[in-house]
Amino acid sequence: MYKRQVYNWKKEEVIGRDDLPKEPSANYDYAINKNLAYTVKNNLYVNGRQITNEPEGIVCGQSVHRNEFGINKGTFWSPKGNLLAFYRMDESMVTQYPLVDITARVGEVNNIRYPMAGMTSHKVQVGIYNPSTDKNIYLNTGDPTNRYFTNISWAPDEKSLYLIEVNRDQNHAKLCQYNAETGELMQTLYEETHPKYVEPQNPIVFLPWDDTKFIYQSQRDGYNHLYLFDTRTKIYPETHTSANGGT
């Protein structure tokens, strides 16, 4: 077991202690209000409480989509730490691929699930957990087959969640806003298509002094630029034909 201690530098005292599991897949994620999310094997825990109970082949709270599109983790606390967004990846339909562990005294085979080209890929959902009610909901994204849900971010008021959806052909990106309480799609703020590819790598970032404006990063003209958008203004789809890909 690991020990977690929260220290108040102003008061010069420890204000909290927790026992944490010693697991290679722990992926500890701390919220600003001291809430803690982590994974044990394929399930997600918050403050020591198991919040998912999935069988082998379904993984919660870990990175998905083979770490493409800037994805490097599977949990996302809201700005005040009151809600937790997380990935749920069903890879039970994906064939297993053997890897040899040469660090063992005698070599051992460890199987991973890896979709070969042209074969069935995993399916991803985005969940939201509320620690105060101990309830999970999942975004109503429709059938997740052949879709990438990337670059998750929160609205400053924690009432909505933003993500960038990419199709399997990776030439169409959509910036979507979902209701954090119901999981319903509120609006698609922006779309970008390209004949070659789009590659969103960064979530949107809201301006600290204006909750209605955010920065969106894109290579839509062939170069990486920052764009200022307004959540209250209709943004029409963009189609680009530059030599390089977009987003």
Which residue stretches match the model-derived regions?
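Predominantly five- to eight-bladed beta-propeller fold
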Residues: 51-75, 86-138
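Short glycine-/Asp-/Thr-/Trp-enriched loop segments that recur within the blades
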Residues: 57-71, 143-149, 194-202, 244-247
